[in-house]
Amino acid sequence: MGRKKIQITRIMDERNRQVTFTKRKFGLMKKAYELSVLCDCEIALIIFNSTNKLFQYASTDMDKVLLKYTEYNEPHESRTNSDIVETLRKKGLNGCDSPDPDADDSVGHSPESEDKYRKINEDIDLMISRQRLCAVPPPSFEMPVTIPVSSHNSLVYSNPVSTLGNPNLLPLAHPSLQRNSMSPGVTHRPPSAGNTGGLMGGDLTSGAGTSAGNGYGNPRNSPGLLVSPGNLNKNIQAKSPPPMNLGMNNRKPDLRVLIPPGSKNTMPSVSEDVDLLLNQRINNSQSAQSLATPVVSVATPTLPGQGMGGYPSAISTTYGTEYSLSSADLSSLSGFNTASALHLGSVTGWQQQHLHNMPPSALSQLGACTSTHLSQSSNLSLPSTQSLSIKSEPVSPPRDRTTTPSRYPQHTTRHEAGRSPVDSLSSCSSSYDGSDREDHRNEFHSPIGLTRPSPDERESPSVKRMRLSEGWAT
Protein backbone atom coordinates (compact mmCIF):
# COMPACT_ATOMS: atom_id res chain seq x y z
CA MET A 1 0.00 0.00 0.00
CA GLY A 2 1.27 3.45 -0.77
CA ARG A 3 0.28 6.89 -1.76
CA LYS A 4 -0.47 7.83 -5.29
CA LYS A 5 2.74 9.00 -6.84
CA ILE A 6 2.90 12.04 -9.04
CA GLN A 7 5.67 13.23 -11.26
CA ILE A 8 7.55 16.17 -9.80
CA THR A 9 7.15 18.75 -12.56
CA ARG A 10 5.62 22.14 -12.80
CA ILE A 11 1.82 22.00 -12.69
CA MET A 12 0.48 23.72 -15.77
CA ASP A 13 -3.05 24.26 -14.49
CA GLU A 14 -3.08 27.35 -12.30
CA ARG A 15 -5.95 26.21 -10.15
CA ASN A 16 -4.39 22.84 -9.48
CA ARG A 17 -1.09 24.52 -8.82
CA GLN A 18 -2.69 26.76 -6.23
CA VAL A 19 -4.39 23.87 -4.47
CA THR A 20 -1.19 21.85 -4.44
CA PHE A 21 0.80 24.79 -3.05
CA THR A 22 -1.65 25.34 -0.21
CA LYS A 23 -1.65 21.68 0.80
CA ARG A 24 2.05 21.10 0.51
CA LYS A 25 2.94 24.39 2.27
CA PHE A 26 0.92 23.31 5.27
CA GLY A 27 2.52 19.92 5.09
CA LEU A 28 5.96 21.45 5.05
CA MET A 29 5.24 23.59 8.05
CA LYS A 30 3.83 20.55 9.85
CA LYS A 31 7.00 18.65 9.21
CA ALA A 32 9.08 21.57 10.51
CA TYR A 33 7.02 21.65 13.66
CA GLU A 34 7.52 17.96 14.25
CA LEU A 35 11.23 18.26 13.65
CA SER A 36 11.63 21.20 16.00
CA VAL A 37 9.73 19.45 18.79
CA LEU A 38 11.28 16.06 18.37
CA CYS A 39 14.85 17.23 17.96
CA ASP A 40 14.85 20.49 20.05
CA CYS A 41 15.91 22.74 17.24
CA GLU A 42 14.97 26.10 15.81
CA ILE A 43 13.41 26.25 12.40
CA ALA A 44 12.53 29.25 10.25
CA LEU A 45 10.77 29.02 6.87
CA ILE A 46 10.58 31.84 4.33
CA ILE A 47 8.37 31.08 1.28
CA PHE A 48 7.46 33.28 -1.71
CA ASN A 49 4.85 32.00 -4.16
CA SER A 50 4.67 32.58 -7.87
CA THR A 51 3.07 35.93 -7.28
CA ASN A 52 5.88 36.93 -4.88
CA LYS A 53 3.67 36.60 -1.85
CA LEU A 54 5.56 35.89 1.38
CA PHE A 55 4.83 32.94 3.70
CA GLN A 56 7.06 32.31 6.67
CA TYR A 57 7.32 29.84 9.58
CA ALA A 58 9.53 30.04 12.68
CA SER A 59 9.68 27.67 15.60
CA THR A 60 10.49 30.49 18.04
CA ASP A 61 11.01 34.01 16.69
CA MET A 62 11.82 34.83 13.10
CA ASP A 63 14.03 37.84 13.87
CA LYS A 64 16.05 35.90 16.48
CA VAL A 65 16.58 33.08 14.05
CA LEU A 66 17.53 35.49 11.25
CA LEU A 67 20.00 37.24 13.53
CA LYS A 68 21.80 34.02 14.28
CA TYR A 69 21.86 33.27 10.56
CA THR A 70 23.61 36.52 9.68
CA GLU A 71 26.20 36.20 12.44
CA TYR A 72 27.09 32.52 11.69
CA ASN A 73 30.40 32.30 9.72
CA GLU A 74 31.39 28.60 10.13
CA PRO A 75 31.14 26.05 7.30
CA HIS A 76 27.65 24.47 7.12
CA GLU A 77 25.46 22.28 4.94
CA SER A 78 23.69 24.10 2.20
CA ARG A 79 21.44 22.24 -0.33
CA THR A 80 19.55 23.17 -3.42
CA ASN A 81 17.05 21.31 -5.64
CA SER A 82 19.78 19.77 -7.71
CA ASP A 83 21.48 18.45 -4.60
CA ILE A 84 18.24 16.82 -3.38
CA VAL A 85 17.59 15.16 -6.73
CA GLU A 86 21.14 13.82 -6.85
CA THR A 87 20.86 12.42 -3.36
CA LEU A 88 17.57 10.66 -4.21
CA ARG A 89 19.09 9.06 -7.29
CA LYS A 90 21.98 7.69 -5.28
CA LYS A 91 19.58 6.09 -2.85
CA GLY A 92 17.77 4.38 -5.70
CA LEU A 93 14.73 6.54 -5.51
CA ASN A 94 13.26 8.31 -8.48
CA GLY A 95 13.72 11.94 -7.84
CA CYS A 96 11.04 12.81 -10.34
CA ASP A 97 8.41 10.86 -8.45
CA SER A 98 7.14 11.77 -5.06
CA PRO A 99 4.20 10.58 -3.05
CA ASP A 100 1.28 12.93 -3.01
CA PRO A 101 0.47 13.64 0.64
CA ASP A 102 -2.89 15.09 -0.27
CA ALA A 103 -4.03 12.10 -2.32
CA ASP A 104 -6.01 9.28 -0.75
CA ASP A 105 -4.55 5.88 -0.12
CA SER A 106 -4.98 3.61 -3.15
CA VAL A 107 -3.50 0.47 -4.65
CA GLY A 108 -0.55 1.00 -6.88
CA HIS A 109 -1.34 -0.06 -10.46
CA SER A 110 1.95 -1.39 -11.68
CA PRO A 111 2.23 -3.40 -14.92
CA GLU A 112 2.81 -6.54 -12.91
CA SER A 113 -0.35 -6.05 -10.88
CA GLU A 114 -2.38 -5.31 -14.01
CA ASP A 115 -1.19 -8.55 -15.61
CA LYS A 116 -2.09 -10.42 -12.46
CA TYR A 117 -5.59 -8.98 -12.37
CA ARG A 118 -6.10 -9.70 -16.08
CA LYS A 119 -5.13 -13.33 -15.58
CA ILE A 120 -7.55 -13.65 -12.66
CA ASN A 121 -10.38 -12.24 -14.81
CA GLU A 122 -9.61 -14.71 -17.59
CA ASP A 123 -9.73 -17.62 -15.15
CA ILE A 124 -13.10 -16.48 -13.82
CA ASP A 125 -14.50 -16.18 -17.36
CA LEU A 126 -13.26 -19.68 -18.19
CA MET A 127 -14.94 -21.16 -15.12
CA ILE A 128 -18.25 -19.49 -15.99
CA SER A 129 -18.10 -20.79 -19.57
CA ARG A 130 -17.41 -24.33 -18.36
CA GLN A 131 -20.36 -24.21 -16.01
CA ARG A 132 -22.62 -23.12 -18.86
CA LEU A 133 -21.40 -25.97 -21.04
CA CYS A 134 -21.97 -28.53 -18.31
CA ALA A 135 -25.56 -27.40 -17.78
CA VAL A 136 -27.22 -29.54 -20.48
CA PRO A 137 -30.83 -28.54 -21.20
CA PRO A 138 -33.48 -31.23 -20.68
CA PRO A 139 -34.49 -33.13 -23.83
CA SER A 140 -37.73 -32.20 -25.55
CA PHE A 141 -38.55 -35.52 -27.18
CA GLU A 142 -40.13 -38.82 -26.25
CA MET A 143 -38.55 -42.19 -26.76
CA PRO A 144 -41.20 -44.93 -26.82
CA VAL A 145 -39.99 -48.10 -25.19
CA THR A 146 -41.77 -51.32 -26.13
CA ILE A 147 -41.55 -53.71 -23.19
CA PRO A 148 -42.94 -57.24 -23.45
CA VAL A 149 -44.45 -58.22 -20.11
CA SER A 150 -43.47 -61.86 -20.42
CA SER A 151 -42.59 -64.37 -23.10
CA HIS A 152 -46.24 -65.36 -23.48
CA ASN A 153 -48.00 -62.08 -22.94
CA SER A 154 -46.52 -59.53 -25.33
CA LEU A 155 -48.63 -56.52 -24.56
CA VAL A 156 -47.21 -53.28 -25.90
CA TYR A 157 -46.52 -50.49 -23.45
CA SER A 158 -45.11 -47.09 -24.31
CA ASN A 159 -43.01 -45.38 -21.68
CA PRO A 160 -42.19 -41.77 -22.33
CA VAL A 161 -38.68 -41.02 -21.25
CA SER A 162 -38.89 -37.34 -20.77
CA THR A 163 -41.53 -35.60 -18.75
CA LEU A 164 -41.08 -32.46 -20.82
CA GLY A 165 -41.84 -34.19 -24.06
CA ASN A 166 -44.51 -33.32 -26.56
CA PRO A 167 -47.75 -34.97 -25.46
CA ASN A 168 -48.98 -35.00 -29.05
CA LEU A 169 -46.36 -37.52 -30.15
CA LEU A 170 -47.70 -41.02 -30.75
CA PRO A 171 -45.71 -44.02 -29.49
CA LEU A 172 -44.57 -46.18 -32.38
CA ALA A 173 -44.51 -49.80 -31.35
CA HIS A 174 -42.46 -52.39 -33.18
CA PRO A 175 -44.47 -54.09 -35.94
CA SER A 176 -43.52 -57.60 -34.90
CA LEU A 177 -44.44 -56.98 -31.29
CA GLN A 178 -47.56 -55.20 -32.38
CA ARG A 179 -48.65 -58.22 -34.36
CA ASN A 180 -48.27 -60.32 -31.26
CA SER A 181 -50.32 -57.96 -29.17
CA MET A 182 -53.78 -59.06 -28.25
CA SER A 183 -55.65 -55.94 -29.24
CA PRO A 184 -56.19 -55.01 -32.91
CA GLY A 185 -56.55 -51.39 -31.85
CA VAL A 186 -57.18 -49.14 -28.92
CA THR A 187 -60.80 -48.49 -28.10
CA HIS A 188 -61.98 -45.49 -26.16
CA ARG A 189 -64.14 -47.35 -23.71
CA PRO A 190 -64.59 -46.28 -20.08
CA PRO A 191 -64.37 -48.95 -17.42
CA SER A 192 -67.93 -48.26 -16.29
CA ALA A 193 -69.41 -49.31 -19.62
CA GLY A 194 -71.19 -52.62 -19.44
CA ASN A 195 -70.16 -55.68 -21.37
CA THR A 196 -72.77 -56.34 -24.06
CA GLY A 197 -72.30 -59.98 -24.67
CA GLY A 198 -68.54 -59.92 -24.95
CA LEU A 199 -68.59 -57.55 -27.92
CA MET A 200 -66.43 -54.48 -27.96
CA GLY A 201 -68.62 -51.39 -27.82
CA GLY A 202 -67.30 -47.91 -28.49
CA ASP A 203 -65.73 -45.92 -31.26
CA LEU A 204 -62.30 -46.46 -32.74
CA THR A 205 -61.26 -42.93 -33.43
CA SER A 206 -57.63 -43.60 -34.28
CA GLY A 207 -55.43 -46.56 -34.98
CA ALA A 208 -52.88 -45.86 -32.30
CA GLY A 209 -54.64 -43.57 -29.90
CA THR A 210 -53.17 -40.80 -27.85
CA SER A 211 -49.83 -41.33 -26.22
CA ALA A 212 -50.12 -42.43 -22.61
CA GLY A 213 -47.91 -43.95 -20.01
CA ASN A 214 -49.48 -47.42 -20.18
CA GLY A 215 -49.66 -47.57 -23.96
CA TYR A 216 -53.41 -47.22 -24.12
CA GLY A 217 -55.42 -44.40 -25.63
CA ASN A 218 -56.51 -42.98 -22.32
CA PRO A 219 -55.38 -43.85 -18.81
CA ARG A 220 -59.02 -43.97 -17.76
CA ASN A 221 -60.11 -46.16 -20.64
CA SER A 222 -60.30 -49.91 -20.86
CA PRO A 223 -57.75 -51.54 -23.14
CA GLY A 224 -60.64 -53.38 -24.78
CA LEU A 225 -58.71 -56.53 -25.55
CA LEU A 226 -60.66 -59.40 -27.08
CA VAL A 227 -59.01 -61.88 -24.78
CA SER A 228 -60.54 -64.59 -22.74
CA PRO A 229 -58.86 -64.37 -19.33
CA GLY A 230 -58.32 -68.07 -18.94
CA ASN A 231 -56.70 -68.50 -22.35
CA LEU A 232 -54.58 -65.38 -22.36
CA ASN A 233 -51.42 -67.27 -23.23
CA LYS A 234 -53.15 -69.25 -25.93
CA ASN A 235 -54.62 -66.28 -27.72
CA ILE A 236 -51.15 -64.82 -28.19
CA GLN A 237 -50.53 -67.34 -30.94
CA ALA A 238 -53.33 -65.96 -33.06
CA LYS A 239 -51.56 -62.99 -34.54
CA SER A 240 -53.47 -59.87 -35.41
CA PRO A 241 -52.47 -57.18 -37.93
CA PRO A 242 -51.43 -53.70 -36.82
CA PRO A 243 -54.33 -51.41 -35.94
CA MET A 244 -55.87 -49.46 -38.77
CA ASN A 245 -58.09 -46.40 -38.83
CA LEU A 246 -61.46 -47.47 -40.17
CA GLY A 247 -62.70 -43.89 -40.15
CA MET A 248 -60.18 -42.88 -42.85
CA ASN A 249 -59.84 -46.18 -44.70
CA ASN A 250 -62.82 -47.66 -46.50
CA ARG A 251 -61.33 -51.14 -46.61
CA LYS A 252 -62.70 -53.29 -43.81
CA PRO A 253 -61.11 -56.49 -42.54
CA ASP A 254 -62.65 -59.91 -42.46
CA LEU A 255 -64.50 -61.46 -39.56
CA ARG A 256 -62.75 -64.37 -37.98
CA VAL A 257 -63.91 -66.63 -35.21
CA LEU A 258 -60.91 -66.84 -32.89
CA ILE A 259 -60.41 -70.38 -31.67
CA PRO A 260 -57.14 -70.68 -29.77
CA PRO A 261 -55.42 -74.04 -29.94
CA GLY A 262 -56.19 -74.95 -26.38
CA SER A 263 -55.98 -78.30 -24.69
CA LYS A 264 -58.79 -80.19 -23.01
CA ASN A 265 -58.07 -78.44 -19.76
CA THR A 266 -58.50 -74.95 -21.17
CA MET A 267 -61.46 -75.75 -23.46
CA PRO A 268 -63.22 -78.70 -21.90
CA SER A 269 -66.60 -78.13 -23.53
CA VAL A 270 -65.65 -77.81 -27.22
CA SER A 271 -64.92 -81.06 -28.96
CA GLU A 272 -61.93 -81.66 -31.17
CA ASP A 273 -64.29 -82.37 -34.07
CA VAL A 274 -65.58 -78.85 -33.82
CA ASP A 275 -62.00 -77.54 -33.76
CA LEU A 276 -61.16 -79.41 -36.95
CA LEU A 277 -64.31 -78.24 -38.69
CA LEU A 278 -63.82 -74.63 -37.68
CA ASN A 279 -60.19 -74.78 -38.77
CA GLN A 280 -61.22 -75.99 -42.21
CA ARG A 281 -63.90 -73.35 -42.53
CA ILE A 282 -61.52 -70.58 -41.48
CA ASN A 283 -58.87 -71.68 -43.97
CA ASN A 284 -61.38 -71.99 -46.80
CA SER A 285 -63.24 -68.75 -46.09
CA GLN A 286 -62.91 -65.91 -48.55
CA SER A 287 -61.11 -62.85 -47.27
CA ALA A 288 -62.53 -60.36 -49.76
CA GLN A 289 -65.87 -59.82 -48.11
CA SER A 290 -66.21 -56.55 -46.18
CA LEU A 291 -67.08 -56.83 -42.52
CA ALA A 292 -67.56 -54.38 -39.70
CA THR A 293 -68.53 -56.71 -36.88
CA PRO A 294 -66.54 -57.36 -33.74
CA VAL A 295 -64.59 -60.50 -33.22
CA VAL A 296 -66.40 -63.34 -31.48
CA SER A 297 -63.97 -65.38 -29.41
CA VAL A 298 -64.90 -68.90 -28.37
CA ALA A 299 -62.11 -69.14 -25.82
CA THR A 300 -63.30 -69.80 -22.32
CA PRO A 301 -61.49 -69.26 -19.03
CA THR A 302 -60.55 -72.08 -16.74
CA LEU A 303 -61.20 -70.13 -13.54
CA PRO A 304 -63.98 -67.61 -13.01
CA GLY A 305 -61.81 -65.05 -11.25
CA GLN A 306 -58.81 -65.36 -13.55
CA GLY A 307 -58.27 -62.36 -15.79
CA MET A 308 -56.22 -59.37 -16.62
CA GLY A 309 -55.69 -57.54 -13.37
CA GLY A 310 -57.28 -54.14 -13.20
CA TYR A 311 -58.70 -53.97 -16.72
CA PRO A 312 -62.07 -55.25 -17.85
CA SER A 313 -61.61 -57.36 -20.91
CA ALA A 314 -64.07 -57.65 -23.74
CA ILE A 315 -65.28 -60.96 -22.38
CA SER A 316 -66.40 -60.89 -18.78
CA THR A 317 -63.97 -62.42 -16.33
CA THR A 318 -66.76 -64.18 -14.46
CA TYR A 319 -67.38 -66.84 -17.09
CA GLY A 320 -67.83 -70.33 -15.80
CA THR A 321 -66.19 -73.33 -17.38
CA GLU A 322 -69.48 -74.73 -18.65
CA TYR A 323 -69.52 -73.19 -22.08
CA SER A 324 -70.06 -74.86 -25.41
CA LEU A 325 -70.46 -73.50 -28.90
CA SER A 326 -73.48 -74.88 -30.64
CA SER A 327 -74.20 -74.93 -34.32
CA ALA A 328 -77.24 -72.76 -33.72
CA ASP A 329 -74.97 -70.15 -32.17
CA LEU A 330 -72.70 -70.23 -35.17
CA SER A 331 -75.61 -70.18 -37.54
CA SER A 332 -77.08 -67.27 -35.61
CA LEU A 333 -74.25 -65.18 -36.92
CA SER A 334 -76.09 -65.19 -40.22
CA GLY A 335 -78.39 -62.61 -38.67
CA PHE A 336 -75.58 -60.07 -39.17
CA ASN A 337 -76.39 -59.97 -42.87
CA THR A 338 -79.99 -58.91 -42.39
CA ALA A 339 -79.85 -56.94 -39.17
CA SER A 340 -76.61 -54.97 -39.53
CA ALA A 341 -75.94 -55.23 -43.28
CA LEU A 342 -72.85 -57.38 -42.65
CA HIS A 343 -71.29 -60.46 -44.20
CA LEU A 344 -69.80 -63.48 -42.52
CA GLY A 345 -66.78 -64.63 -44.45
CA SER A 346 -65.94 -67.56 -42.23
CA VAL A 347 -69.50 -68.82 -41.69
CA THR A 348 -70.64 -68.70 -45.31
CA GLY A 349 -70.20 -72.40 -45.82
CA TRP A 350 -72.14 -73.17 -42.68
CA GLN A 351 -75.03 -71.02 -43.82
CA GLN A 352 -75.27 -72.73 -47.20
CA GLN A 353 -75.20 -76.23 -45.76
CA HIS A 354 -77.21 -75.94 -42.54
CA LEU A 355 -79.36 -72.87 -42.81
CA HIS A 356 -82.40 -74.95 -43.68
CA ASN A 357 -82.10 -76.73 -40.33
CA MET A 358 -82.73 -73.52 -38.38
CA PRO A 359 -86.33 -72.47 -37.83
CA PRO A 360 -87.34 -68.93 -38.79
CA SER A 361 -88.18 -68.04 -35.19
CA ALA A 362 -84.63 -68.50 -33.93
CA LEU A 363 -83.16 -66.55 -36.82
CA SER A 364 -85.57 -63.68 -36.32
CA GLN A 365 -84.82 -63.53 -32.60
CA LEU A 366 -81.09 -63.54 -33.20
CA GLY A 367 -81.44 -60.90 -35.88
CA ALA A 368 -83.34 -58.60 -33.56
CA CYS A 369 -80.80 -59.12 -30.82
CA THR A 370 -77.92 -58.51 -33.20
CA SER A 371 -79.40 -55.26 -34.44
CA THR A 372 -79.85 -54.11 -30.85
CA HIS A 373 -76.41 -54.92 -29.50
CA LEU A 374 -74.30 -54.27 -32.58
CA SER A 375 -75.66 -50.86 -33.50
CA GLN A 376 -72.77 -49.16 -31.75
CA SER A 377 -70.06 -51.62 -32.75
CA SER A 378 -69.73 -50.91 -36.48
CA ASN A 379 -66.35 -49.18 -36.46
CA LEU A 380 -64.04 -51.73 -34.92
CA SER A 381 -60.88 -53.12 -36.42
CA LEU A 382 -60.91 -56.91 -36.58
CA PRO A 383 -58.02 -59.33 -36.53
CA SER A 384 -57.82 -62.01 -39.18
CA THR A 385 -56.46 -65.28 -37.89
CA GLN A 386 -53.98 -67.42 -39.70
CA SER A 387 -54.14 -71.15 -40.09
CA LEU A 388 -54.32 -72.86 -36.71
CA SER A 389 -52.69 -76.16 -35.92
CA ILE A 390 -55.47 -78.12 -34.24
CA LYS A 391 -55.43 -81.78 -33.48
CA SER A 392 -57.66 -83.57 -35.97
CA GLU A 393 -60.05 -86.37 -35.13
CA PRO A 394 -62.40 -88.34 -37.38
CA VAL A 395 -65.71 -86.61 -37.89
CA SER A 396 -68.89 -88.55 -37.46
CA PRO A 397 -71.62 -87.99 -40.02
CA PRO A 398 -74.45 -85.83 -38.70
CA ARG A 399 -77.72 -87.48 -37.81
CA ASP A 400 -81.09 -86.29 -39.03
CA ARG A 401 -82.87 -85.36 -35.83
CA THR A 402 -85.24 -82.45 -35.78
CA THR A 403 -86.69 -82.90 -32.34
CA THR A 404 -85.88 -79.54 -30.78
CA PRO A 405 -83.66 -77.56 -33.13
CA SER A 406 -85.10 -74.23 -32.08
CA ARG A 407 -84.24 -74.65 -28.43
CA TYR A 408 -80.46 -74.52 -28.27
CA PRO A 409 -79.07 -74.87 -24.78
CA GLN A 410 -78.13 -72.11 -22.44
CA HIS A 411 -75.71 -73.77 -20.04
CA THR A 412 -75.93 -70.95 -17.53
CA THR A 413 -79.07 -69.37 -16.22
CA ARG A 414 -79.87 -65.73 -16.62
CA HIS A 415 -78.79 -65.05 -13.02
CA GLU A 416 -75.49 -66.93 -13.28
CA ALA A 417 -72.23 -65.07 -13.74
CA GLY A 418 -70.74 -67.24 -16.51
CA ARG A 419 -72.01 -66.32 -19.96
CA SER A 420 -70.45 -66.75 -23.36
CA PRO A 421 -70.52 -64.01 -25.98
CA VAL A 422 -72.94 -65.90 -28.18
CA ASP A 423 -75.07 -66.91 -25.21
CA SER A 424 -75.43 -63.28 -24.32
CA LEU A 425 -76.56 -62.55 -27.84
CA SER A 426 -79.07 -65.32 -27.74
CA SER A 427 -80.36 -64.69 -24.25
CA CYS A 428 -81.19 -61.04 -24.88
CA SER A 429 -84.27 -61.98 -26.89
CA SER A 430 -84.95 -65.45 -25.57
CA SER A 431 -88.03 -65.94 -23.45
CA TYR A 432 -86.96 -69.22 -21.91
CA ASP A 433 -85.96 -69.30 -18.27
CA GLY A 434 -83.17 -71.38 -16.78
CA SER A 435 -85.31 -74.46 -16.05
CA ASP A 436 -86.59 -74.69 -19.64
CA ARG A 437 -83.10 -74.49 -21.03
CA GLU A 438 -81.86 -77.17 -18.66
CA ASP A 439 -84.74 -79.47 -19.64
CA HIS A 440 -83.80 -79.46 -23.31
CA ARG A 441 -80.05 -79.69 -22.86
CA ASN A 442 -79.90 -83.40 -23.55
CA GLU A 443 -82.26 -83.21 -26.52
CA PHE A 444 -80.40 -80.57 -28.50
CA HIS A 445 -79.41 -81.44 -32.07
CA SER A 446 -76.55 -79.87 -34.02
CA PRO A 447 -76.58 -79.86 -37.83
CA ILE A 448 -72.78 -79.96 -37.95
CA GLY A 449 -72.15 -82.46 -35.22
CA LEU A 450 -71.81 -80.28 -32.17
CA THR A 451 -74.15 -82.30 -29.95
CA ARG A 452 -73.42 -85.29 -27.85
CA PRO A 453 -73.67 -88.61 -29.62
CA SER A 454 -76.53 -90.94 -29.01
CA PRO A 455 -76.14 -93.78 -26.53
CA ASP A 456 -75.38 -96.27 -29.28
CA GLU A 457 -72.71 -94.03 -30.82
CA ARG A 458 -71.34 -93.14 -27.38
CA GLU A 459 -70.45 -96.80 -26.73
CA SER A 460 -68.95 -97.37 -30.20
CA PRO A 461 -65.17 -97.89 -29.98
CA SER A 462 -64.54 -96.99 -33.63
CA VAL A 463 -65.66 -93.39 -33.26
CA LYS A 464 -63.69 -91.08 -30.93
CA ARG A 465 -65.85 -88.22 -29.70
CA MET A 466 -65.21 -85.97 -26.75
CA ARG A 467 -68.25 -85.68 -24.57
CA LEU A 468 -69.67 -82.25 -24.12
CA SER A 469 -70.51 -82.99 -20.52
CA GLU A 470 -66.87 -83.65 -19.58
CA GLY A 471 -65.25 -80.97 -17.50
CA TRP A 472 -68.44 -78.99 -16.83
CA ALA A 473 -68.24 -77.14 -13.53
CA THR A 474 -71.56 -77.34 -11.72
UniProtKB/Swiss-Prot annotation:
- Effect of knocking it out? Mice show impairment in hippocampal-dependent learning and also increase in the number of excitatory synapses and potentiation of basal and evoked synaptic transmission. Mice surviving to adulthood manifest smaller, apparently less mature neurons and smaller whole brain size, with resultant aberrant electrophysiology and behavior. Mice exhibit thrombocytopenia and a defect in B-lymphopoiesis.
Where are its TM segments located? Answer: none
Name the reported effect of S59D. Answer: Enhanced DNA binding activity
Q: Which residues bind DNA?
A: 58-86
Please quote what the entry notes about the protein's domains.
The beta domain, missing in a number of isoforms, is required for enhancement of transcriptional activity.
Superkingdom of source: Eukaryota
In which residue ranges is the amino acid composition biased (Low complexity)? 420-433
Query: Does the record carry Manganese as a key word?
Result: no
**Species assigned in the record:** Mus musculus (Mouse)
Give the location in the cell. Answer: Nucleus; Cytoplasm, Sarcoplasm
Q: Which residues form a coiled coil?
A: none
Name of protein: Myocyte-specific enhancer factor 2C
What SMART domains does the record tag this protein with? MADS
